[in-house]
Amino acid sequence: MVPSADRTRPVVTDADLDVLREQLGRPARGVVGVAARCVCGRPLVVRTSPRLDDGSPFPTTYYLTSPQAVAGASTLEATGQMVGLTEWVRTEPIAAAYQRAHESYLADRSELGDVPEIAGISAGGMPTRVKCLHALLGHALAAGPGVNPVGDEVLLRLRDTWRPDRCTC
């Protein structure tokens, strides 16, 4: 995986937008940067505006786009792994780390603008539960190891079927 996007150079190219359209099956909305890339250079995660062009608030700052990563997170969700992960994030020191991940997510989003409707709301159920593995995996890929404990755990659980350091595009 290519490290998190250079925040001083958040440009999204036309080629990126073409790949995103292919990955998502629709035009990408609110993209302000590519937050993580596959080793081949294609987007894995995009950074999105907290308010879409139509005025809608959009709390998912880090949106997972890689179809293979999305499928992996979906498989984990379908097998009920969020229940055990929610129990896990209620134990120390994981609870404190998950709270810091929540705060990090909010700080990253605040760099993009203030949207009162979603103030204090991060993504994926943070800071007290696990609701969406896609959002948590996207955050982990964008922020790097050690920031989001659940996203890091999802990466570990996917390692036999999907890894960001191996191209499966």
Regions found by a protein language model. Give the residues of each.
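Preference for intrinsically disordered or flexible, low-complexity segments
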Residues: 2-169
